Amino acid sequence: MNKANQLVINYHITEKCNYDCHYCYAKWAKPNELHRNVDEMKRVLSKLAEYFLSPNPIQQQLQYQSVRLNFAGGEPLLLKQRLIDALDFAIELGFETSIITNGHLISDEFIAKHSHKLQLLGVSYDACRYEVQKQIGRITRSGNVLSVERLQSIFKQVKRHSPSTKLKINTVVNQFNSEEDFIGVMASLQPDKWKVLRVLPVFDSIQTISDQQFESFIERHQSLVHCMSAENNDSMTNSYLMLSPDGAFFQNGNGSSGYFKSRPLLTTPIDVALAESGFDAIKFAQRYH
């Protein structure tokens, strides 16, 4: 069954980040980011709403009931009020919303004021040990990391302020954390979903891991199968509907190319840009089954 209850559009709103993860593919050589011109950003979001929230070929194919705009980065919370404004506008247009963040900038105030707006809050978390976080690059310039204790506090507060907001952890299995043990931390966090992704060699500089390393990580965490969703490289390719910071659809490629982009949505009809993007709706649906 190639059906999906919800279509997800991942809007990589900024390339800026307070971390420097070695495997990150969110690098667009500092494009002209759409959010800097609020009117243009609103035009693009409005075009997306007009197309995807009305009958269209993808909707006919997947039979989705709702569309979620997922704000990603870089680190979206670096944009502060500009992110909140984009979030509020997306809700006004009729989107469900979510954020994927490294969690470092989530304040208690942010949770109290805004967590109820989110259908889902995702936190990228690759290691519990400081040394491994440092090797991966999940560390600020001043040497700070997101501790397990702070992550637990974030989850607890979101559950209190917005019980309907689903909580997700994303973990990228890479050369540095393939031996990490997440059983204890997941038992304490109780996420609705733990997405385990194999590091994707989008650029030549990104070190891959072997099938065996990835599979043994999954096997070691079999006790978490009730919340774990594992994605190998093939299932990740062409199965995400992604918008770059400058407002074009893109897909991850491999090697030196990094990614493939459509023309900008500001000046291109959505259906044309969609055809240029290489998005595969069937592969998207398969990730949710």
Regions found by a protein language model. Give the residues of each.
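Flexible loop residues that form catalytic
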Residues: 29, 103, 126, 199
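Radical SAM enzyme [4Fe-4S]-AdoMet core and its adjacent flexible, acidic
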Residues: 33, 129-250, 257-288
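Acidic (Asp/Glu)-rich catalytic clusters
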Residues: 49-53, 113-117, 186-190
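Acidic-and-aromatic substrate-binding clefts and catalytic sites of carbohydrate-active enzymes
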Residues: 76-79, 104-108, 173-179, 203
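Short glycine/proline-centered loop/turn elements that form peptide/ligand docking sites
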Residues: 101-103, 254-257
